[in-house]
Amino acid sequence: MKPNRIVMKVYGKYALFTDPMTKIGGEKSSMMIPSYETLKGIVSSMYWKPSFNWVIESVKVLNPIRTERKGIRPIKYNGGNDLAYYTYLSDVAYIISAHFEFNKRRPDLQEDWNENKHYYVAKRALEKGARRDIFLGARECPAYIEPGDMSEPGYYDDKGTLSFGLMYHSLCYPNQNDEGNLYSRFWHPQMENGIIHFCRPEECENTIFLRKGTKKELSNIPILGVDKEELLSGYQEGGELQ
């Protein structure tokens, strides 16, 4: 077991993990399971720093997969309203297992590669319910998180193997690859007795080029770690300047 692993439960009344195939037509429909990128966003909302990246290991689906259609009046680009039907997942709950790895593309933040510090800060953030608001795919689908356990009983515990075909996995941003391009990744997920084990982003079987991107320039501001003596230089106990 990885020492920096976090296991959380996330749940909400509705979820909208929009299928890219339905996004263009205006009537969104949710994928049946959350994508890697969605879960990474949920965990990052709990706690994130640019010095490390979250890696999603697996997710357990606790409740039956059910959908519900809603009539929505989205705002038109030129004003006024339109009528559309969105298909949501209803009464969703998941157990997410994830760990963090230090961002080797940010050597300027090497002083912040403190595993114990980030692990315990993330653990406290999880116990308090995250640092930022949690959403299940869309702003209108608020959710809540708490410490979880993969052994919690779920609806699909004895349902065997379920396949979901070719599905969206994640995005690869320009600052995450040497070419500086934006890519979309796809894979074939399978659920074994309610648990989906994710492949790493670089292991996805299908990668599609989207567009040429621009890498963000990194600053040369020196970063000090929390264990550096000079970090508190000039201060005395109580936080006051000497």
Listing of model-derived features with the role each one plays in the protein:
Residues 22-40, 120, 124-129:
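Short, flexible N-terminal segments of the mature chain
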Residues 29-71:
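Glycine/small-residue-rich interface belts in oligomeric ring/scaffold proteins
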Residues 5, 56, 91-95:
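Extracellular structured ligand-interaction cores
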Residues 16-18, 67, 104-106:
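Residue-level signal for secondary-structure boundary sites
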Residues 10-14, 63, 96-104:
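Beta-strand elements of well-folded, non-transmembrane domains
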Residues 1-26, 196, 215-216:
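N-terminal, Lys/Arg- and Ser/Thr-rich interaction peptides
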Residues 19, 54-56, 107-109:
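Short, hydrophobic/aromatic beta-strand segments
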Residues 74-76, 81-242:
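Internal, well-folded beta-alpha domain core
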